[in-house]
Amino acid sequence: MSIDSLDMEARGVGRLLNEDGTPGKVIFVEGALPGETVSYRSFRRKPSYEQAHLVEVRQESVMRVKPGCQHFGVCGGCSMQHLDSRAQLAIKQRVLEDNLWHLSKVKPDVVFRPIAGPDWGYRYRARLTVRHVAKKGGVLVGFHERKSSYVADMTRCEILPPHVSAMLVPLRELVGGLSIRDRMPQIELAVGQEVTALVLRILEPLTDADKDLLRAFADQHKVQFWLQPKGPDTVYPFYPADAELAYTLPEFGIRMPFKPTDFTQVNHQINRVLIGRALRLLDAQPQDRLLDLFCGIGNFTLPLATQGKSVMGIEGSEALTTRALANAEYNGLAARTEFACRNLFEVTAEDIAALGRFDRWLVDPPREGALAVCKALGELAQQGSNVLPQRIVYVSCSPATLARDAGLLVHGAGYRLAGAGVVNMFPHTSHVESIAVFERG
């Protein structure tokens, strides 16, 4: 069978022909690439499609490359290592444009050059699963196997920073020596500028011997351990207690302290480039009042504060709102910033109107998108309100919800999609991050 394209999960897509020559059932083949002729084995059959494993590549695509990780194909952390990095970007751009058009009949005036950076060692945040497996004689620490609840037997990971990848085997040995080796379901990783933090989710208290092992490991590998006995709000630094987790935005002279459970961007290098492009697209003037929705700890808010007259950040999490305020004070930007905690998934037109007019907005929602915000703007446009901003820069981590929201802004609130492009925040995965700019009038 010939493979024509890739789907959102990086599976090759081919189509069988019926006996009369008309297009038949769609076949999704894991590991196959566009332009290839393959043989496959189906493992799930439905009336209109089948899912299949790749058996043999009979004609190879020019886009196929050797995966950079020995665990690729088993580990579920990556799905595109067999695809040339330039082709990955092109496919992600096509996914973005297809979603915009097919879901909302919207096309960008300009397609931006993709934002891309290092393909390896980029992942500064990760959630690793811990599993005590008696049959394997120890503990596994890593990502899940592809489409499985099993943990991959990983000895290194090429998308993690090299010092973290080199720590995986010692970390397995450490956990295997703890009394609660079977009562620690996950380890959350957060890498800062100077500190690497490991958050241990513990279901039972550590013994004194366990604590000694953690201290010795932290000293040897230059990491900081945090403990999480219950929910995310119970996280606290264990050892060393005084290390500060932070990342920097040197272009703006900003340092951003954060807790390892706070939301921060996975890819530090791409984050810096993304902020720079977002600010250039927003093109704030010295007299402008700016609004940053879903502001988190102030990742965009504080750089924006160096551009316009003032900026207001709104965030749904009280903890993140508090952190954003503290970061503004830490960086000497408190006088030019204001923060509020609001549920932006339930915001109304009246709520938006009550904020007053802001000249330009930056919107950076989670995967759910900004549905309520965009609906509210549509209602305000119908009312002839003067609070709608001239320009909106929208940073998205889901092309489907961006497309939905773009349709509301373009068809309901009088904006045009001036430009859009992909941001390769997660190389070698099918995750599509993007940035778009909307203009009104």
Swiss-Prot record:
The keyword Iron applies. The keyword Iron applies. Keywords: 4Fe-4S, Iron, Iron-sulfur, Metal-binding, Methyltransferase, rRNA processing, S-adenosyl-L-methionine, Transferase. It comes from the Bacteria. Its EC number is 2.1.1.190. S-adenosyl-L-methionine binds at Q265, F294, N299, E315, N343, D364. It catalyses: uridine(1939) in 23S rRNA + S-adenosyl-L-methionine = 5-methyluridine(1939) in 23S rRNA + S-adenosyl-L-homocysteine + H(+). SUPFAM superfamilies: Nucleic acid-binding proteins, S-adenosyl-L-methionine-dependent methyltransferases. GO terms for molecular function: 4 iron, 4 sulfur cluster binding; iron ion binding; RNA binding; rRNA (uridine-C5-)-methyltransferase activity. Belongs to the class I-like SAM-binding methyltransferase superfamily. RNA M5U methyltransferase family. RlmD subfamily. Catalyzes the formation of 5-methyl-uridine at position 1939 (m5U1939) in 23S rRNA. HAMAP family: 23SrRNA_methyltr_RlmD. This is 23S rRNA (uracil(1939)-C(5))-methyltransferase RlmD. It comes from Cupriavidus necator (strain ATCC 17699 / DSM 428 / KCTC 22496 / NCIMB 10442 / H16 / Stanier 337) (Ralstonia eutropha). The gene is rlmD.
